[in-house]
Curated annotation (Swiss-Prot), chain A:
InterPro entries: Acetalactate_synth_ssu (IPR004789), Acetolactate_synth/TF_NikR_C (IPR027271), Acetolactate_synth_ssu_C (IPR019455), ACT-like_dom_sf (IPR045865), ACT_dom (IPR002912), AHAS_ACT (IPR039557), AHAS_small-like_ACT (IPR054480). GO terms for biological process: isoleucine biosynthetic process; L-valine biosynthetic process. Residues 4-79 form the ACT domain. The keyword Transferase applies. It catalyses: 2 pyruvate + H(+) = (2S)-2-acetolactate + CO2. PANTHER family: ACETOLACTATE SYNTHASE SMALL SUBUNIT, ACETOLACTATE SYNTHASE SMALL SUBUNIT 1, CHLOROPLASTIC. GO terms for molecular function: acetolactate synthase activity; acetolactate synthase regulator activity. This is Acetolactate synthase small subunit. Pathway: Amino-acid biosynthesis; L-isoleucine biosynthesis; L-isoleucine from 2-oxobutanoate: step 1/4; Amino-acid biosynthesis; L-valine biosynthesis; L-valine from pyruvate: step 1/4. Keywords: Amino-acid biosynthesis, Branched-chain amino acid biosynthesis, Transferase. It comes from the Bacteria. The keyword Nucleus does not apply. GO terms for cellular component: cytosol.
Amino acid sequence: MKRIITLTVVNRSGVLNRITGLFTKRHYNIESITVGHTETAGVSRITFVVHVEGENDVEQLTKQLNKQIDVLKVTDITNQSIVQRELALIKVVSAPSTRTEINGIIEPFRASVVDVSRDSIVVQVTGESNKIEALIELLKPYGIKEIARTGTTAFARGTQQKASSNKTISIV
Amino acid sequence: GTNVQVDSASAECTQTMSGALMLIESLKKEKVEMIFGYPGGAVLPIYDKLYNSGLVHILPRHEQGAIHAAEGYARVSGKPGVVIATSGPGATNLVTGLADAMIDSLPLVVFTGQVATSVIGSDAFQEADILGITMPVTKHSYQVRQPEDLPRIIKEAFHIATTGRPGPVLIDIPKDVATIEGEFSYDHEMNLPGYQPTTEPNYLQIRKLVEAVSSAKKPVILAGAGVLHGKASEELKNYAEQQQIPVAHTLLGLGGFPADHPLFLGMAGMHGTYTANMALHECDLLISIGARFDDRVTGNLKHFARNAKIAHIDIDPAEIGKIMKTQIPVVGDSKIVLQELIKQDGKQSDSSEWKKQLAEWKEEYPLWYVDNEEEGFKPQKLIEYIHQFTKGEAIVATDVGQHQMWSAQFYPFQKADKWVTSGGLGTMGFGLPAAIGAQLAEKDATVVAVVGDGGFQMTLQELDVIRELNLPVKVVILNNACLGMVRQWQEIFYEERYSESKFASQPDFVKLSEAYGIKGIRISSEAEAKEKLEEALTSREPVVIDVRVASEEKVFPMVAPGKGLHEMVGVKP
């Protein structure tokens, strides 16, 4: 099962190495990592998307992460009401003849063209991972030259709804 | 450099000094008694400040010897072992010891030299990314970037190594950091927001445990090294007596509960007693204290404690639920938790039937061996002699393998902190240097290193340290001219294909000892043991005793890998 785990860590050298090493040591697969500064100086936020076997693995992973001296807080936010976003840059083969057509495709995704060359364009899209995948699928027939994805970054919404089932798939 | 020689008692205000001197002053602040170390290029500035510092430095003959000695010292004294090694190969020679200390939760503060900051990352001479190499086997690690950070880092390192679940902390010091001067102060507050080990148990869980005990019919305590790390053996005894709950030990827990106590069931696990293993198999309440359900203890998990409610007391929350589904998780320090449980003074369980059953098993299935000298001098008998001649009061250090299991089985410990063994990692070559560390921690104790002829040859160069310091360590080599446990498994599981487990040649260990200036004696029979062993073990000088034991003897009882504890074989002659 896929889990989204966020960590706040003291931004010291080696902290990321320790954490990713821990994943290797305990045999967990990382799908993506994002790291960046937080509102507090010297504290970074790391968002992991991981694949684990079951609840027990999540608990063990969370506890092992918590044991790290430089880790301040570990939260498995998968079942919370969350905002999760990923950014992708997609270089699509595009002759002038197909450019309008592609624009028509990306528009509902609120994606934008951020670079144009003679035979390709670069599309920038942000959103949840499955939205990005949907767009990639639609662009595939034109020929994708390159994709760069940031991986998911996420945190809990300010207001938590009760049931986890009423999570809406937002395309915005 | 213009170094200010600072009296450690008066260095309250800040002083300017080199990183190397800061290190020395910090160690004094931490009241370090001795350092186990080995010099080299990158730590020259540190060793220069060590000179005339008044700190005791033990020089082993290999860095691995230094760190295992520090482990032995830590295990026996309860204080952190301090190690220094140079960069590159000096540092990488520590890796086995770090892994050993990590898995057996021993507090170490390890300093490694590093090449100068200006050349880090350039594959400089004797450069190794020791932080990267040791991350999975250290509780925490640091690389010092500027001398001012050293005191803070050292203070944190000692705190982290010795609190919570103890473990090794590594501090990597680039050569220039040791030379550059900075402001020294050791008064700063510790600021580790991400490190706050839980020591006080949750009251609700304590109540649940008290109730579980009162309603149990077949309770048992499994006590591990956490009892020793928490200095809680007195509390364990009081609790077990108050509640009348029988106690089994893990390998590393031995000594935490007196072996001759009527409630003691022996060691559990792969080569544990029938009674301890059946107790874990049949119990309806298993209270694990400072143990981590190692596979060598549990056997096949499908069968382990299959009808039992599990209560798990551990200072490391990550151990709870890691292996066993736990109904009563108690995170806390073993001593504090046991004190709280004793204070509760709950109702005892109605377990007279259970205790009758356990007593019957104890009577029916004691540890055994066939005392037949035609097969050679039995190693179990040798351990019994060692026990007899040291009055059961020695500190015993071992490697891993058959000799370790026989020591665990036939040297019953009455007291805590007498047993120094490599449990989790199973490190050959651990016993001899660990015995040196133990002897340095307990100068008046009788320290016996029980080793195999295989493991002995991995770290025997440390005999020179024994000679140099005239430590009265007794090295008993259970010499069967093979890797006994490997041989045993090959005999049982690999149809007697003894692939590379028998040594085709062997040095003369007596002459070897003499070459080191240490008395060496050879014992080849029970008669010789009776004649020579007592004197050798009770003298106050170092001795190496080469004992030729029956080479085909196997360790029993045994739980084969993949089997449940109840499926153990070799429970009777």
